[in-house]
């Protein structure tokens, strides 16, 4: 699933597509490449980190029939299947926070190229002449053994795979191919 932006419209598409994309599948690849950011990392993480605490079966069915949970009971769509996340040097801001978070919590393999390192929270206000000024008001830090400021410190993939001009000209997605191969090793 490609997450185009870390914003409400993209979140709604992600939540809709998550259920369909996971049906009958064993693994999932999320893609935040070429994503300018936004604010929805925590909501996406909630969908891929929610634990399975129970399952249901219809009355009289074999109780060994596992894996079904009533979708109307879920607050958000969720998956617990193996996941890899794609990022690149055009993953900015909240897409970088997503990449750092995915790696920090160990949810799967981060694949691609290091993100740009452009992570801050900004607000904006208008001046009397009608221009708008944006000001940073918050820094973001990786929550691991050595907290690092995400500003100027992009997320470093577990598998660094460049997307070359030759790949682009032949429409070959080497990063996606490597992410898929890595997932197949984990599910087999």
Question: Which stretches of residues belong to each language-model region?
Answer:
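C-terminal structured "cap/appendage" subdomains that terminate the fold
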Residues: 107-166
